[in-house]
Amino acid sequence: MTEAQHQGDWADRMEQAVLDSAIERAPALGWNGRLVRAACEAQGLSRGDEELLLPNGARDLAALLWRRHDDQAMAALADIDPATLKIRERIARGVEARLEAAAVDGEAEKRVAGFMALPTNADLALTLTWATADRLWRWAGDSATDWNHYSKRAILSGILVPAMTLRLFDGKAAADAFVAARIENVMSFEKWKAGKDFDAPMTRITDLLARLRYGARA
């Protein structure tokens, strides 16, 4: 093992250890710099170590928790064959798995939700939610590469955030009902959209750009 690999393994292990300490302390301290320092101290890390491990402080720690829950959700979905489910069932199961992963660390996740709601963290919240939506759609079998790739992830991102809030603060039944209603809304829209050539404007733009770049076809 090279020195770089050893350092990388240490960093990965220590990130998870610090995250465990943070989850334990978040209900009392909130999600902030104080929490980061306390969690790092619990693992015997100096301020210098903390700055190396989590240069963006509480933002990095929030991202670690979010991605842990993503990984846990995907592990829970690993034994499910999405091909045996209708598309709406795939999305419902995927969202449910992600919400339940977060609910395990409910009190800490509530602090993260408040932290992510701050205007200064909007970019982080958007990036992480989009990544979650992408992983869920890929599990569901989505292979779109056109503008539908982006619209699907944008729509699912818009479902995930309020559903997460409902799961944490109002419980599973409220979250499940919300998700079911939103999926029904989306499916109704897709049925209405079917047969209408909404791709035409995008196709014309693509053709125009191709002509500008490569010239008119002979």
Q: Which residues fall in each region the model found?
A:
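C-terminal peripheral helix-coil segments that are non-catalytic and often amphipathic
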Residues: 2, 169-218
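Short, amphipathic alpha-helix enriched in basic
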Residues: 2-48, 56-63, 67
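Hydrophobic alpha-helical connector segments
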Residues: 12, 76-111
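Residue-level detector of well-ordered alpha-helical segments, enriched
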Residues: 18, 35, 61, 65, ...
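Amphipathic alpha-helical segments used for helix-helix packing
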Residues: 101-123, 127-130
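Amphipathic alpha-helical packing segments from all-alpha helical-bundle domains
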Residues: 120-142, 150-160
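Hydrophobic alpha-helical segments that form the core
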Residues: 149-168, 177-185
